């Protein structure tokens, strides 16, 4: 199947400006296409991945992706999908975010080779345009009536929208025009909320370059979970690509915990597995759901893609240790990842009796309860049961002098940081 057929099979196409024309174009030649992201933060989350996974598929099919980091538009604020004005960021913060997002993109895409990925920053071609040029050369080509009719603006008319955010669609249209004339970009990809901005770009190109210009837009559906909620959030909030914000273990666990009703859809959306392999896994979901093979494959594919093979192996190791209770096999760094969301306590490195220590930390409510739990075999330290109420807790019990793991009962883990 060609790239458009594959995208449609994967359920990744929402709207196209000219399906027949785009299909014919990609069958005739390899094209350049672009997708942009504004540096509103210093990391993307998994919701941002959706259009860039499509870009990656085009790249693997031999087409040339152009990734735009919005160093200019990021200082303005995209009103799409928002009910209120964005808080403007300083140029210094925007530049910091640009650098961080650029580094993330370089990890996700291969640079060099037959299908080289280009990174561009729209600040480079917009910062020297003065207000007169903006109004004469670009603003003249936009009708206020059509701008007001765009969903991204119409939805804000009751609550209010600033002139700054109102003109965002002009800036994004300028991006498409610039990339069309300078990089021969013929296709823009975006989320479903970007349809109005994308069509503004098509209109501008045709007005400035002629109606025969072959340019296209394609949007991706809003991805919802089976319960109707928006994809991309965990119980702890957004799932980030930055390992400092969401550890590779947490990232892996997010995908492992995918609902059976969603997992096949996610395999199509996010992985590069073949149709045959995904069909096999879909059968396993129906016939052997308890094995969660599809979820494990999804988690492995996504963790390796975003964080690399080594981080995947570490996440799998932590998962296995937590399931089996074999905590001693983990390193201190792995403990830090695996127990990040567990109840955490702080302790000195001073040697203490286990009973006194558990009560002082607040893990046990009283000495009597602590002794009772120890005598009943309900307390484990670093994966080994504590059977003697006279046991001393020393720094030698810790992982690299940093952590001690206490388990009370079967599942109640606590992380104790020494310092």
From Swiss-Prot:
Q: Which UniProt keywords apply?
A: Aminoacyl-tRNA synthetase, ATP-binding, Cytoplasm, Ligase, Nucleotide-binding, Protein biosynthesis, RNA-binding
What Pfam families does the record point to? SYY_C-terminal, tRNA-synt_1b
Which residue numbers delimit the S4 RNA-binding domain?
352-418
Q: Which GO terms describe its molecular function?
A: ATP binding; RNA binding; tyrosine-tRNA ligase activity
CDD domains, alphabetically?
S4 (cd00165), TyrRS_core (cd00805)
ATP-binding keyword on record: yes
Query: Which top-rank group of organisms is this from?
Result: Bacteria
Q: Name one GO cellular component term.
A: cytosol
The UniProt record gives the binding positions of L-tyrosine as 34, 168, 172
List the catalytic activities from the record: tRNA(Tyr) + L-tyrosine + ATP = L-tyrosyl-tRNA(Tyr) + AMP + diphosphate + H(+)
How does this protein assemble?
Answer: Homodimer.
The record describes the protein's role as: Catalyzes the attachment of tyrosine to tRNA(Tyr) in a two-step reaction: tyrosine is first activated by ATP to form Tyr-AMP and then transferred to the acceptor end of tRNA(Tyr).
Q: Which family does it belong to?
A: Belongs to the class-I aminoacyl-tRNA synthetase family. TyrS type 1 subfamily.
Q: What HAMAP family does the database record attribute to this sequence?
A: Tyr_tRNA_synth_type1
Mind telling me what this protein is named? Tyrosine--tRNA ligase 2
Which source organism? Bacillus thuringiensis subsp. konkukian (strain 97-27)
């Amino acid at each position: 199947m060609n790239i458009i057929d594959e995208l449609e099979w994967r359920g990744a196409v929402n709207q196209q400006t000219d399906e027949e024309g785009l299909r014919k174009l990609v069958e005739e030649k390899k094209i350049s296409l672009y997708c942009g992201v504004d540096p509103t933060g210093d990391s993307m989350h998994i919701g941002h991945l959706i259009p860039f996974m499509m870009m990656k598929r085009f790249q693997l099919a031999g087409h040339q992706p152009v990734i735009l980091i919005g160093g200019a538009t990021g200082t303005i604020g995209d009103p799409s999908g928002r009910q209120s004005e964005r808080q403007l960021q300083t140029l210094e913060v925007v530049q910091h975010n640009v650098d961080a997002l650029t580094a993330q993109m370089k990890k996700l895409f291969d640079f060099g080779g037959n299908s080289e990925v280009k990174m561009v920053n729209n600040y480079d071609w917009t910062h020297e345009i003065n207000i007169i040029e903006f109004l004469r050369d670009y603003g003249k080509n936009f009708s206020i009536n059509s701008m007001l009719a765009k969903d991204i603006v119409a939805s804000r008319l009751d609550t209010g929208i600033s002139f700054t955010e109102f003109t965002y669609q002009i800036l994004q249209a300028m991006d498409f025009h610039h990339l069309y004339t300078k990089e021969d970009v013929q296709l823009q990809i975006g989320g479903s909320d970007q349809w109005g901005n994308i069509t503004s770009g098509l209109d501008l190109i045709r007005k400035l370059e002629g109606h025969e210009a072959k340019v296209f837009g394609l949007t991706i559906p809003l991805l919802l979970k089976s319960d109707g909620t928006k994809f991309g959030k965990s119980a702890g909030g957004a799932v980030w690509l930055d390992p400092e914000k969401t550890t590779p273990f947490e990232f892996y666990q997010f995908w492992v915990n995918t609902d059976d009703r969603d997992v096949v859809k996610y395999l199509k959306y996010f992985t590069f597995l073949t149709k045959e392999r995904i069909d096999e896994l879909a059968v396993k979901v129906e016939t052997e759901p308890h094995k969660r093979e599809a979820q494990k494959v999804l988690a492995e594919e996504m963790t390796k893609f975003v964080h690399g093979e080594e981080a995947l192996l570490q996440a799998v190791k932590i998962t296995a240790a937590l399931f089996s209770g074999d905590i001693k096999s983990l390193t201190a760094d792995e403990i830090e990842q695996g127990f990040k969301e567990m109840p955490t306590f702080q302790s000195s490195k001073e040697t203490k009796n286990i009973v006194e220590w558990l009560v002082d930390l607040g893990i046990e409510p009283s000495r009597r309860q602590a002794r009772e739990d120890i005598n009943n075999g309900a307390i484990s330290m670093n994966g080994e049961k504590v059977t003697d109420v006279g046991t001393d807790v020393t720094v030698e019990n810790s992982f690299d002098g940093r952590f001690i793991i206490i388990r009370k009962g079967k599942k109640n883990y606590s992380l104790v940081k020494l310092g």
